[in-house]
């Protein structure tokens, strides 16, 4: 759900499902649709601090960018599983019109040692550690994953999309809900949450691209009514993985697939 369009970053929590919306810190915000933001005939600029879903078409089609690269940073001790990242790549390759999708080798960054992280702290960490952003005139759109060594201030949240190309995941929360007796594997939880949060930045469920058929759970914003779809609202929370998840990594569903195909 697109709740905020102010020049201030804002946080919305709807029934435990969280989306964080950011804005440009530039005095002249620009976006992927700006033909000539500088007015001097130079290549279009790209705003990597827009709201989740704002760059959905740039991800889905090859009209502006033919390649996707994902930068992955993780705090020491919380490296994401390769199988979880491979599962995400396979899903993106099925749905995105890109000649190449590359997930870079995860890079370790210093653990901060904080038990929780606020929205502002997450943005600050990205400013410090993110190496690659999308450049105007390039064939490559860059996305960013940040895996933290603590929890979000709302401890039930597993991951979030907080800018149009940026997603964060809470390593300590994932650790607590995986690997134990009767708990799912870390790989399957990561694979599921990676898809879900990337789905927000693909504009799914009326969060940047139109629905071909109505499947929005309006009570929970940009989430699907189908509880077998990876965009089901509860997937962002620990309760889902503790009580509902059967180990099957959900796909984007028939309706979500239709929505993405219409943009290719």
What does each of the following model-derived ranges do?
Residues 19-22:
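C-terminal motif of bacterial Sec signal peptides marking the signal peptidase cleavage site
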Residues 1-11:
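Bacterial N-terminal signal peptides that target proteins for export
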Residues 133-209:
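Active-site-proximal segment of zinc-dependent metalloprotease catalytic domains
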Residues 181-256:
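The catalytic-center signature of Zn2+-dependent metalloproteases
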Residues 27-151, 261:
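Propeptide-to-catalytic entry region of secreted or membrane-anchored zinc metalloproteases
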